[in-house]
Amino acid sequence: MRLRGLSIIFCTLAVAATIPAIAHHSFAAEFDINRPISLDGVVTRFELSNPHSWLHLEITTEAGEKQQWQVEGGAPNALIRRGWTRTSVPAGIQVHVEGFQARDRSFRASGREITLPDGSSLFMGSVGIGAPSTE
C-alpha cells in the first residue's frame, strides 16, 4: 500500500513538472493574436539557434526614436526546411516583418513573415499551440 501511495505522489509530481514546459511552448501564453504588428527596420543580428530563432531589429519610430526589437521565429529545423540559412538575413539590411506583439507589450514579437529587400518573403513562424494557421 505504501508503495502505491509513493507511486501516485511521484506520478503527480512528474506531471506537474511538465506544465511550465507546455505553457512555455504555447503561442497564446506569450503573444497576443489580437495585436498583429508590422515592423520595418534594420537587422542588427539573426540567430538561427535552438530552441527558437531570433531576429534583432532596430526600428526608427515616426517620432525619430530608436527601438530595439526581438522577433522570435520558429525552430531552426523548421526554418531550414523552408529555405532559411544562417546568411538569409544578414545584419544591415532593411526588412519588413509581420507578426504578433508580446502580451507584456515589450519590444518583442512572434514573427510570421519577413520580406527581404529583393521583395522575396520567408515564413518565419512556427505552427505551435495557439499560433495562427498558416493556411
Could you say what each language-model-derived stretch is?
Residues 8-20:
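Bacterial N-terminal signal peptides
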Residues 41-43, 94:
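Conserved hydrophobic positions within beta-strands
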